C-alpha cells in the first residue's frame, strides 16, 4: 500500500463530448419549428473549442446559445466553462462561445488557496495547467474533491490519476 496518495485537478474537456453536443445542437436546429425560415448556423472550431453561432435575428441568436448550452449540459460539460467571446451585428448577428479547457493561473490560485484554507492534511502544488494534491489518507483527497466541486469556478473541473 502506498504511503502517499495523490490526484491531479484539471479542466480538460472531452473533445468527443464537445463534438457530440455540437452535432445534437445542429440536429435540433434543423428540426425546431420556431427557427424555420430564419437563416441560422452553428459551427464548431475543434482546435480552439469555439462555437460560432450566426442568425439573421438577434432574438434567435439567444435561442441558438440556449440550444448549445443545453446540449453541453446533457453531455456532462459544466455550463460555467462556456464564455461569450464576441457578439457582432450587421446583416447577420454572430456570437462566439469558447469552452475553457485549461486552468488559468487565477483559478489555480483560487483552488490552491481554498485547499490551504480548508486545514486538511494535504499538500497542493500548481503544475502548469494542473494542480497536484498529495495526502496520506484517501479520505482527505475525497474531501478536497468535494471542496473543489463546491467552488464557484468557470471551469469544467475533472480529477485524474488518483493513486
Curated annotation (Swiss-Prot):
TM ranges: none
A GO CC annotation given for this chain: cytosol
Highest taxon of the lineage: Bacteria
Keywords attached to this entry: Nucleotide-binding
InterPro entries, A to Z: DUF520 (IPR007551), UPF0234-like_C (IPR035571), UPF0234_N (IPR035570), YajQ-like_sf (IPR036183)
GO molecular function: nucleotide binding
Xref: Pfam families: DUF520
Record-linked HAMAP family: YajQ (MF_00632)
Similarity comment: family membership: Belongs to the YajQ family.
Protein purpose: Nucleotide-binding protein.
Name of the protein this chain belongs to: Nucleotide-binding protein CJJ81176_0398
Amino acid at each position: 500500500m502506498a504511503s502517499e496518495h495523490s490526484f491531479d485537478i484539471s479542466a480538460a474537456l472531452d473533445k468527443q463530448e464537445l463534438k457530440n453536443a455540437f452535432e445534437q445542437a445542429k440536429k435540433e436546429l434543423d428540426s425546431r419549428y420556431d427557427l424555420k425560415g430564419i437563416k441560422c448556423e452553428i459551427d464548431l472550431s475543434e482546435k480552439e473549442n469555439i462555437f460560432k453561432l450566426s442568425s439573421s435575428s438577434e432574438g434567435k441568436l439567444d435561442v441558438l446559445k440556449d440550444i448549445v448550452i443545453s446540449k453541453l449540459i446533457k453531455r456532462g460539460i459544466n455550463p460555467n466553462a462556456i464564455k461569450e467571446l464576441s457578439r457582432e451585428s450587421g446583416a447577420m448577428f454572430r456570437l462566439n462561445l469558447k469552452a475553457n479547457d485549461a486552468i488559468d493561473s487565477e483559478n489555480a490560485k483560487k483552488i490552491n488557496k481554498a485547499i490551504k484554507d480548508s486545514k486538511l492534511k494535504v499538500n497542493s502544488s500548481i503544475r502548469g495547467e494542473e494542480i497536484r494534491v498529495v495526502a496520506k489518507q484517501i479520505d482527505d483527497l475525497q474531501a478536497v474533491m468535494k471542496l473543489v466541486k463546491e467552488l464557484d469556478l468557470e471551469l469544467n473541473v475533472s480529477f485524474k490519476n488518483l493513486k
